[in-house]
Amino acid sequence: MTDMLTTSRRPETPGQFLVAALYHFISFPRFADFREPLQAICDANGVKGTLLLAHEGINGTIAGSEEGIATVLAFLRAQPEFADLVHKESRASAMPFLRMKVRLKKEIVTMGVENIDPKKVVGTYVEPKDWNALISDPETLVIDTRNDYETAIGVFQGAVDPKTKTFREFPEWVRNNSGLHNKPKIAMYCTGGIRCEKATAFMKEQGFEEVYHLKGGILKYLEEIPPEESLWEGACFVFDERVSVTHGLQEGEHTLCHACRQPLTTEDLRSPLHEEGVSCVNCHDTRTEEDRERYRQRQRQIVLAKKRGARHLGS
């Protein structure tokens, strides 16, 4: 079962890159053998990003030219397992990835709980146009399934933030919070939908009956719902060099601390604790001076690479 995102194609703007986010839960026993041909087709077409392969399917985000992305997607859909693959598109003003990585994993999204299978049991999908009504219902408890560094820059109004460091911590958070049963409806959301596939399956397994999740995730909501009708506050963290997007999937104003990979606001950049590529308000006090000197050396290499018109792989 996959979260059926509607593909929305936009006219290509010169100088922009097409970004395609995708996932598909399917029994895929030959996933290890598929790694090399998938890597090769991406490399041959100048496509970069990360794709994860596992027994349970595929997950990832890639970017490239319109033609390059179309070729890779056609290759994927030519496989019997991915004939029904649906992807989500957005744009980037610069290539948002440094390289192309196809990785073999135990799970395409890591929860670490055995026997959770979204192909068999999953929550009820809610279209973006119906989401506001659901989360405004006093009988609904809204839960953000993302990590703390993501929720720090944007959330839905009234959502409960588990403040997890990784998705692996989510099941334990649920088990430790008996009060979650106090409301009859549970509404869950994440960036693009994949974490909610497993999170809602887990909630159903834990005995929650009315479990809903936002179809297409925050990204689909930001694409379809105009700002004046939106219950979203802030920006949505994305796992590439854009760092964040806002309504209409426009690139946000956040940057990334290359020391700790946390998103930074313009206010964070003005902090005396911020040193580009070395430290920020989130990590300054957790790093030793030896760490910071190592980061400074890396930052100098990044600056030199930029002057040569190249991109340093450590950036």
From Swiss-Prot:
Rhodanese domain boundaries: 136-230
Protein family according to the UniProt entry: Belongs to the TrhO family.
Function: Catalyzes oxygen-dependent 5-hydroxyuridine (ho5U) modification at position 34 in tRNAs.
Pfam families membership: Rhodanese, UPF0176_N
Cross-referenced PROSITE patterns: RHODANESE_3
Known catalytic reactions: uridine(34) in tRNA + AH2 + O2 = 5-hydroxyuridine(34) in tRNA + A + H2O
SUPFAM superfamilies found in the cross-reference section: Multiheme cytochromes, Rhodanese/Cell cycle control phosphatase
EC number: 1.14.-.-
UniProt entry keywords in alphabetical sequence: Oxidoreductase, tRNA processing
This protein's name: tRNA uridine(34) hydroxylase
GO molecular function, one term: oxidoreductase activity, acting on paired donors, with incorporation or reduction of molecular oxygen
Residue numbers annotated as active site: C190
Gene3D superfamilies xref list: 3.30.70.100, Rhodanese-like domain
tRNA processing in keyword set: yes
A GO BP entry: tRNA modification
Gene behind this protein: trhO
